Amino acid sequence: MAGHDSGNARRGRASFGAFVRKPVERDSVANAGQAAEQGSPEATQAWPDDAVEVGAVVDAYGLKGWVKVATHADAGRGGDALLNARRWWLERGAERLSVRIMQSKTRSDTVVAQPAGVSDRDAALSMRGFRVFVRREDFPALAADEFYWVDLIGLEVVNEQSVALGKVSGMIDNGVHSIMRVEYPATGKDGQPTTDERLIPFVGVYVKTVDQAARRIVVDWEADY
């Protein structure tokens, strides 16, 4: 979920939040931090205002209560928010839990973790299907010219002539760089109001400024492109 920036090699490199959900588990190990907090998964209605979905529990890992999470972005590209957070919020249907994380580490493009109070494989297996959320404030800090996708969604896009081009509705990773999906109101062939889309590469040659405070992105892009 990152992209190469031909005008600014960092813009758009770290990305997260607009994702393709990964349906499978994968494998390989690297250590992350651990916390000496105690507790157990507990039902909660107190959902953080800045909660961002970052993955889903897909399996147990080992015999001692660890879970395996398929992440929506690789570690180092936003998925490491799971490693940074000491508390996860879990949702499966109408069921919501809050859980402290004792240890976590990467295993290929998954994250494996030990939730407090989950002590055996059966308990870990019972957590399959939970979607995993962390607070936006738990995402690792980025350099000034790097952005998480989740922070770009909904921003207004205008060109250098101040012509409104639409709003960012999503992001695409084409393997080389990130691409903004910019939706704007249009008229269909039947004369009825509809929504159309522009695809604008999120690279320095086109993206001139990203002002998150003003919720605006300025691009070098004509309205008739």
Curated annotation (Swiss-Prot):
SUPFAM superfamilies: PRC-barrel domain, Translation proteins
Protein name, as recorded: Ribosome maturation factor RimM
Encoding gene (name): rimM
InterPro entries: PRC_barrel-like_sf, PRC_RimM, RimM, RimM_N, RimM_N_sf, Transl_B-barrel_sf
Principal subcellular localisation of the protein: cytoplasm
Record's comment describing the protein's domains: The PRC barrel domain binds ribosomal protein uS19.
Family annotation (Gene3D superfamilies): PRC-barrel domain, RimM
Species of origin: Burkholderia orbicola (strain AU 1054)
PRC barrel domain: residues covered: 144-225
Keywords recorded for this protein, A-Z: Chaperone, Cytoplasm, Ribosome biogenesis, rRNA processing
Localisation per UniProt entry: Cytoplasm
Family statement: Belongs to the RimM family.
GO-annotated cellular components: cytoplasm; ribosome
Quaternary structure (record): Binds ribosomal protein uS19.
GO molecular function, one term: ribosome binding
GO biological process: ribosomal small subunit biogenesis; rRNA processing
Record HAMAP family: Ribosome_mat_RimM
Biological function: An accessory protein needed during the final step in the assembly of 30S ribosomal subunit, possibly for assembly of the head region. Essential for efficient processing of 16S rRNA. May be needed both before and after RbfA during the maturation of 16S rRNA. It has affinity for free ribosomal 30S subunits but not for 70S ribosomes.
